[in-house]
C-alpha cells in the first residue's frame, strides 16, 4: 500500500489535480467603482502595456547598476539603484490599479518580454554612454505612452488612473531623466538615431 503524500508534496499533488484559473487574463471583473466597463477595459489594457515597459525599465536599471564601470562607477551605481527602487514602487502601483479596475496584471517575465516596447539589452556589459542612451530611450517610450494614456483616462473620467499616470509615472520618469542626463552632461551619448525618433518608431505599432 503506497503512502499518501504529506506536506509540500501533498500541496503539489492537489495543485496538479485542479489546475485552473479563476480569473483568466483579459477577462474583466465588474466592480462598483462608478466607471463604465468600456473605460475599465481600456485602462486595464493600457496599464498592462505600461506595466510591461516599467518592469523592463526597472530591470534595465538593475542591469546597469550591476554592470556599470569607469570613473563614475560609484555615483552611477548608487543612482541606478535608487531609480530601481522608485520604478519598483511604480510597478506595484500600476499592477494594483489593474487589479482594482477588475483586470489581471501582467506578472511573469516571459509575458513582460513579449509585451514590452523597450528593446532588449545585450547580456554583456556596455560602456556608460551606451547605458545612459539606452535608459533615456526607455524613459522616452514610457513617457510618450503615459501621456497618451493619461489623456485617454481623463476623457473617460477614470480619475484614479489619470492621477497615477500624471502624479506617479510621468513625474517620476521626468525626474529620473533629469538626474541621469545631467549626471553625464559632459559625456557624449551613443545612439544610432535620435532618442525621439527611436521612441516614435518603437511606439508606431502601439495604438491607443
Where are these regions (language model features)?
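Iron-associated oxidoreductase/ferritin-like identity signal
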Residues: 1-208
